[in-house]
Amino acid sequence: MLTDLRFALRQLAKTPGLTLVAIISLAVGVGSIVTVLCWTRHLVQRPLPGVADQQELVMLVSNQGGGNVSIPDLSDFVAQAGVFTGALVFMPTPASLEIERQAEWTNAQVISANAFELLGVKPILGRTFLPDEDRKPGGNPVVIISERLWRRRFASDPSVIGRVVDLNRHSFTVVGVAPETFVGTMAPTLTDVWAPASMIWEVRNQSTQFLTQRPWRGWLNLARLRPGVSLAEAQAAVETVNARLTQDHADTNRDVRHRVVSLAGCPWSAAAVLGPVLQLLLAVCGGVLLIVAANITSLLLARAIDRRKEIAIRLAAGANRVRILRQLLTESIVLSLVGGAAGVLLARWAVDALPLL
C-alpha cells in the first residue's frame, strides 16, 4: 500500500496543473458546504452566543400585541406555572450614543435587571444590574456596554466604569462591560448598550405604563425552564395559567392566550431570520459540489485516456490488472483527501470569520 501511495504522489506531481485545479475545485466545493452546515448547526443549537444552557430557554408568545407580552402576565406565568426558574423582558431600539461629543447610531436594549444572571453572562468589568434598578421609572440611569463598544470607543480602558455617556440625549453611567462572546438577546443583530427596563422612557421614549399595566403588551421575553421540563410540559402548565388569568383578569385577558416556543423557534431568532437564507445557500453549495465532482471526473477520465499507452505497456510487461486499478484508485483517493482537507481548512477559516458562531 505504501508503494502505491508513493507511486500515486509521483503521478500526480507529473501533472501539477491538473492536480492543482482538482484540489482547488474540491476545496471550494467541500469548504462551502461544510461552512454552511456548520453555520446551520450553530444557529439551531446555539442561537444566542455567550449564553449558558440555551436548551432551557424559551419564549412566551401571546396572540395579541404582535406576539409580545406584558410584565404582569409574564410575572404570573413564572410564579404560577411552576416550570420556570425565571424570565426576562426586553425591547430593542436604535439609539443615538454620544461619547465625548462624538455621536453615533447604535443598537440598544432596555432589559430586565435580572437578565445577565438569568442568561449566565458575567461581565468582564464592573457589574450587572442590581435587582432594584428596573423598579423605579427613570430612577436608575446606568448602562452595560458591549466589549466591542468598549474596545472601539474606549480603547479597552479599564477605567471605563463610572464614565458617563449620553443615550438619546440622556446621561447614563457605565457600570459594566459584557464579555466579547455575548452579542445580546437578538442575535444575529449585535447589541452594544443595555439599560434597565425602568429607563424605557429615556431610551425608547415610551410610556412607563409598560412596566406595570397588564394590557400593555409590548415586551419580548425569554424564560428559563426548570431542568428536565420539556416544551410540552411547559405548554400544558402555561395553558392552566392562561385559564386562570382569563378568569381573574377578564377585563384584560378574556381573549388572550399565551404559548411556549423554543429559542430556535422565536420569530426574531437567528435561526428564524437566517434559516431560509442558509437553506438556499446549502442547496447552492450542494449544486456546486456536484458540478465540481463532475468536472473532476472529466479531468481524471481525460488523464486516464492520455495514459492509455503507459497502461498498455505495463499490461504487456506482465503487470497485474488489479494492481493497476488499485494504483489508479489510490491516485483518486489521494486527490480527494488533499482536496477535502483543504476544504475543511477553508471552512474553518470561514466559520471563524463569522463572530456570531
Describe the role of every protein-language-model region.
Residues 15-43, 292-294, 337-341:
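Short, strongly hydrophobic transmembrane alpha-helices
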Residues 9-17, 292-336:
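Intracellular coupling helices
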Residues 35-39, 259, 297, 332-357:
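Small-residue-rich transmembrane alpha-helices
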Residues 94, 108-131, 140-279, 352-357:
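Mid-to-C-terminal secondary-structure elements
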Residues 59, 72-130:
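Short amphipathic beta-strand/extended segments in non-transmembrane regions
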Residues 28-56, 301, 350-357:
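Alpha-helical transmembrane segments
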Residues 1-18, 49-53, 63-66, 102-105, ...:
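Membrane-helix entry/capping segments
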Residues 40, 45-94, 216-222:
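Membrane-proximal extracellular/periplasmic loop immediately following the first transmembrane helix
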